């Protein structure tokens, strides 16, 4: 059984047979409309966000399997805040303010993809992404909030 795998980013619920999906899967000889329909069905909850999709096609039978990843952490943070982009000058310009509770929510969504072994550390990883995006957490630089988490200031958030 020879199989080929393609990984691609598509907008949740809005995959089309055009680029970038069409040119990537066209040469595989699988039914493109079935692929598009299944991707749209599986990514409908991530509307407006770029979602990683993995398509594995059996070259002999032309069967395919689609697995959906979670959107990048940056996309989840932006969606949670309801903004288009982070700061264009992180460190000098603040784009928005995020709460530890919001960071925890994103950490739960991304937990399987993160390196952390518990939600506290996963939340700190999400806060690190916020720092890179020019987004404050709890009204201050995310690095300070990470220290506060280490000191136990937000332990009540992680025991919910």
Swiss-Prot record:
<dbReference type="GO" id="GO:0003735">
    <property type="term" value="F:structural constituent of ribosome"/>
</dbReference>
<comment type="subunit">
    <text>Part of the ribosomal stalk of the 50S ribosomal subunit. Interacts with L10 and the large rRNA to form the base of the stalk. L10 forms an elongated spine to which L12 dimers bind in a sequential fashion forming a multimeric L10(L12)X complex.</text>
</comment>
<dbReference type="InterPro" id="IPR036796">
    <property type="entry name" value="Ribosomal_uL11_N_sf"/>
</dbReference>
<dbReference type="Pfam" id="PF00298">
    <property type="entry name" value="Ribosomal_L11"/>
</dbReference>
<dbReference type="GO" id="GO:0070180">
    <property type="term" value="F:large ribosomal subunit rRNA binding"/>
</dbReference>
<comment type="similarity">
    <text>Belongs to the universal ribosomal protein uL11 family.</text>
</comment>
<dbReference type="GO" id="GO:0006412">
    <property type="term" value="P:translation"/>
</dbReference>
<feature type="region of interest" description="Disordered">
    <location>
        <begin position="141"/>
        <end position="160"/>
    </location>
</feature>
<dbReference type="InterPro" id="IPR000911">
    <property type="entry name" value="Ribosomal_uL11"/>
</dbReference>
<protein>
    <recommendedName>
        <fullName>Large ribosomal subunit protein uL11</fullName>
    </recommendedName>
</protein>
<keyword id="KW-0699">rRNA-binding</keyword>
<dbReference type="InterPro" id="IPR020784">
    <property type="entry name" value="Ribosomal_uL11_N"/>
</dbReference>
<keyword id="KW-0687">Ribonucleoprotein</keyword>
<comment type="function">
    <text>Forms part of the ribosomal stalk which helps the ribosome interact with GTP-bound translation factors.</text>
</comment>
<feature type="compositionally biased region" description="Basic and acidic residues">
    <location>
        <begin position="141"/>
        <end position="150"/>
    </location>
</feature>
<dbReference type="InterPro" id="IPR020783">
    <property type="entry name" value="Ribosomal_uL11_C"/>
</dbReference>
<dbReference type="InterPro" id="IPR036769">
    <property type="entry name" value="Ribosomal_uL11_C_sf"/>
</dbReference>
<dbReference type="InterPro" id="IPR020785">
    <property type="entry name" value="Ribosomal_uL11_CS"/>
</dbReference>
<dbReference type="GO" id="GO:0015934">
    <property type="term" value="C:large ribosomal subunit"/>
</dbReference>
<keyword id="KW-0689">Ribosomal protein</keyword>
<dbReference type="Pfam" id="PF03946">
    <property type="entry name" value="Ribosomal_L11_N"/>
</dbReference>
<feature type="compositionally biased region" description="Acidic residues">
    <location>
        <begin position="151"/>
        <end position="160"/>
    </location>
</feature>
<keyword id="KW-0694">RNA-binding</keyword>
């Amino acid at each position: 059984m020879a199989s080929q795998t393609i990984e691609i980013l598509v907008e949740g619920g809005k995959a089309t047979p055009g680029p970038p999906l069409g040119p990537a899967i066209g040469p595989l000889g699988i039914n493109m409309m079935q692929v598009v329909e299944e991707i749209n069905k599986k990514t409908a909850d991530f509307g407006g966000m770029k979602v990683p999709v993995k398509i594995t096609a059996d070259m002999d039978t032309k069967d395919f399997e689609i697995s959906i990843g979670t959107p990048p952490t940056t996309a989840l943070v932006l969606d949670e805040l309801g903004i288009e982009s982070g700061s264009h000058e992180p460190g000098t310009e603040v784009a928005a303010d995020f709460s530890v509770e919001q960071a925890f929510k994103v950490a739960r969504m991304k937990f399987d993809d993160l390196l952390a072994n518990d939600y506290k550390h996963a939340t700190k990883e999400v806060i690190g992404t916020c720092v890179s995006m020019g987004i404050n957490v709890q009204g201050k630089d995310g690095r300070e909030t990470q220290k506060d988490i280490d000191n136990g200031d937000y332990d009540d958030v992680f025991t919910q």
